[in-house]
C-alpha cells in the first residue's frame, strides 16, 4: 500500500511539474522579445511577422488591427520601407505572467526613435507598452495576441 501511494505521489508530482513553467520558458519568452526588437530594427517585415502565430491578432497604437501572420507582415512592409525605415526600438521592463504551462501574458515597455511623419519630419522619441498573449509551440513561444499603446507625455 505504501508503495502504491508513493508511486501515485510521484505521478502527481510529475504532472504538476510538467505544468509549471520553467526558467527555460522565461528565457524563451525573453528571446522572443529580443527577436521581435531585432526584426524591427532590421526593418525586416518577414522576420518581424515570424514572431507571431499563424492566427495572431495584432492591434497597433492607432487601433489598426490585423489577423494572421501574413497580414501582420503585409501591414508592416510598407511602413518599414517608408516612415519606419530609420527607426530604432528598444525594449525593457519585461514582465511575464504565466497563465498556464503554455500561455503567458507579457508586458514590454518600448522606446522608438527615427520615425517620420508623412511630410518627412522626424517624430520625437516615442514610448509605450506592448501587451502580448504568447503561446508555446514546441520549444518556441510566439505572439498570439498583441496590443500596442503609446504613452502620452504625462505617462512616460
Segments (PLM) and residue ranges:
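A short acidic/glycine-rich loop-to-helix N-cap element
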Residues: 118-124, 153-156
Amino acid at each position: 500500500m505504501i508503495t502504491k501511494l508513493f508511486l501515485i505521489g510521484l505521478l502527481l508530482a510529475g504532472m504538476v511539474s510538467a505544468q509549471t513553467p520553467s526558467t527555460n520558458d522565461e528565457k524563451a519568452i525573453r528571446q522572443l522579445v529580443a527577436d521581435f526588437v531585432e526584426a524591427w530594427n532590421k526593418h525586416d517585415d518577414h522576420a518581424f511577422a515570424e514572431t507571431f502565430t499563424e492566427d495572431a491578432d495584432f492591434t497597433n497604437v492607432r487601433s489598426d488591427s490585423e489577423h494572421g501572420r501574413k497580414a501582420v507582415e503585409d501591414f508592416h512592409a510598407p511602413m518599414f520601407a517608408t516612415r519606419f525605415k530609420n527607426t530604432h526600438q528598444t525594449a525593457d521592463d519585461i514582465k511575464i505572467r504565466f497563465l498556464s504551462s503554455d500561455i503567458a501574458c507579457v508586458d514590454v515597455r518600448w522606446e522608438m526613435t527615427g520615425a517620420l511623419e508623412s511630410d518627412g519630419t522626424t517624430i520625437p522619441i516615442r514610448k509605450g507598452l506592448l501587451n502580448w498573449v504568447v503561446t508555446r509551440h514546441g520549444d518556441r513561444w510566439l505572439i498570439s495576441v498583441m496590443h500596442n499603446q503609446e504613452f502620452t507625455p504625462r505617462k512616460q
